[in-house]
Every structure is written in C-alpha cells, then in structure tokens.
Amino acid sequence: MIQTDILIIGAGPTGLFAVFEAGLLQLKCHIIDALPQPGGQLAELYPKKPIFDIPGYPSVLAGDLVTNLMEQIKQFQPGFTLGETAETIEKLEDGTFIVTTNEGTKHQAKAIAIAGGLGTFEPRKPILKDLEFYEIEDRGVEYFVKDPEKFRNKRVVIAGGGDSALDWTIFLKDVAAEVTIIHRRTQFRGHPDSVQKVMDMDAQKDIQLIVNSEVVQLKGDAESNHLSAVGIATDGTEELNWVECDYFLPLFGLSPKLGPIADWGLNIDKAAIEVNTFDYSTNVPGIYAIGDINTYPGKLKLILCGFHEATLMVQSAFKRIYPNKNNVLKYTTVNGVQGF
C-alpha cells in the first residue's frame, strides 16, 4: 500500500506543479498517470511545440517545460505510479481514501487532486474511407506533431480551424516544403493573432489557405501504400480539388473521456468536473479537481490557470490534513525552499 498526503491523478504540468506547492507546506505527494512518463499531453503529444504564455519564458518547448517542472519538484521526492489508470476509490471512516489502479496498485491518501487534463484523450477523427489504413505504419495520416523534423521538406495538409491547426500551420511553414490548411468555414476558432498570421502567410504565398472546404477523400501510392493526395470538396462546387501531399494532419481537437473517474460520485458537466473556485474542491469533501479536467464559470484552459488552481488547492488540502495547524504564507524569496 502506497501512503501519501495528497494523491495526484495526472502527471501533466498542473499535477507536477501541485507537487511543488505541496512540498512548500511539507506535504508528501504521489502521482498516478496512465502514460509511461510524466508530462501529460506536453510530453506525449507535442513535446517540441513552443509555448509562449508561461510567465518568465518568452518561449519554451513543451518538453522542456516538463523537464524544468520535474527538476523543480525533485527536492520533494514525489512518488509515481506510471502506466496505470486510477479505477476505484473508497473513503474510509478516518476520512482518508483508498484508490486502486487497473493493475491493482493501492494508494492511501488524505486528499485527492484530480489533475488529469482531458482525462484519457483521443483525437477527433474525420469520417473518411481508408482512414485507418493510412493511420498505421507511418503511411501519412497523423494526429499529433511529436517531432516537427518528421515533416522536414515534406508536403503537409492540415485540416482544422482551432488553435492547434493554426499553431502548427505557422510552425511548420519553416519546416515543411509546402503547407496547406483547410477549414470548412471562413471564421476560425483560434486566437485572433494566430488567425491573422495565417491570413498574412497565405497572402504572401508562404502557405495555401482553403476555406469553406473539407477533405472528403484520401488517395495513396499503390507501391508504397503511402498517402499521396487528399480530395477537397468546396461549397458550391461539384468537382473535387486534389492536393498532393506526404502527410495529412486532421487537427480537430481531442475527445475528453473521464474514464472510471466518472463513476466516483462527482458532479460532472460535459466530461468536466464541477468545482468551487474558492479552493477547487468538488462536491465530495477531500477530492479536488485542477487543470483542464475541471469546469466553473469563466474557466480558461491554460497552463497558467492550472498553476493558480494547484496553489489554492494545496492550501485547502493542508487545512483538511492539519485542521489544528496554522498555515502562515511564506515567500520563497525570503525563506527559500526546504526539500525532504
């Protein structure tokens, strides 16, 4: 039985930073994550993607941010149960919780922080004939950009109208031989600055932007079994426009799934856990939810916001674990950081 003060479910940036904040209060943490390594989406889906809205970092690669967070929390010696999924929870008479994973690993904790990002995440896929054929063995359909160098000097078609599609269009412009972005509408859902950059790049013929259109067919090379072109249908026209490509990236976002946590008796709204913004507690005393997995009025799914939520959550968890202790806020600039 693994015993800890706070059991954190999810080893993404929010969960990792919660370890640091807990360590400042001398609270021990243990983290469960279904992935084989810490970092969540940052490490698994886009480690080479630059992030621009972390305070103090004009730009930082997602993978480097994870590395820095791991270095920051090392002094607090967190435990990890990786490659396993939290399945069942039991609340004991003393107020502690027993969480058991799909592999049977048991954890006892005085507080639970669910920081699972989107839970188990799967890409939203277009409905296309032969899609599964081109998904396997590097045949041309990709849903994530883990290593941009894979697309060096290649012809890339991106479909989507959100931040992910826009960001990778901008980034791959200087990597790929050709970049085409296709959106079924004229209005984009992404950040206005990114939208303007893509518009400007199209005007300068650095990329090709095709709107009011969607990919409806895939074509491959008979000898290599690799994707060679996508067929595009445009509103108001009957003929397909074929664009030759080496890779097709349908970036329509992720489908969030809470998995077994959905059966833990928590108030849930559209696959997100409802919380009180005072301390990011759920309707079950002792269980908190922080990061992208929670929801509340005005919620912003930003790493920065997750850090804030983790900080307030830990303060509340301390009061729950040590109800008779006074917690005086200490500044690290004055007191430094004392590890375990």
Predicted segments with their positions:
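A Rossmann-like FAD-binding core segment of flavoenzymes
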Residues: I73-T101, K106-A109, K173-T277, N326-T332
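Rossmann-like NAD(P)H-binding beta-loop-alpha module
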Residues: R152-V175
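FAD-site-proximal beta/loop scaffold in flavoenzymes
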Residues: K129-K150, Y247, L251-L304, L312, ...
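FAD-binding core/adjacent interface of flavoenzyme oxidoreductases
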Residues: M1-I9, C29, Q37, G79-K154, ...
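Conserved N-terminal glycine-rich FAD pyrophosphate-binding loop of Rossmann-like flavoproteins
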Residues: P36-V60, H191-V195
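N-terminal Rossmann-like FAD-binding beta1-loop-alpha1 element of flavoenzymes
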Residues: T4-I31, W168-K173
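A conserved FAD-binding loop/helix module that cradles the flavin
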Residues: W168, I293-F340
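Glycine-rich FAD pyrophosphate-binding loop
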Residues: G23-E44, T180-G190
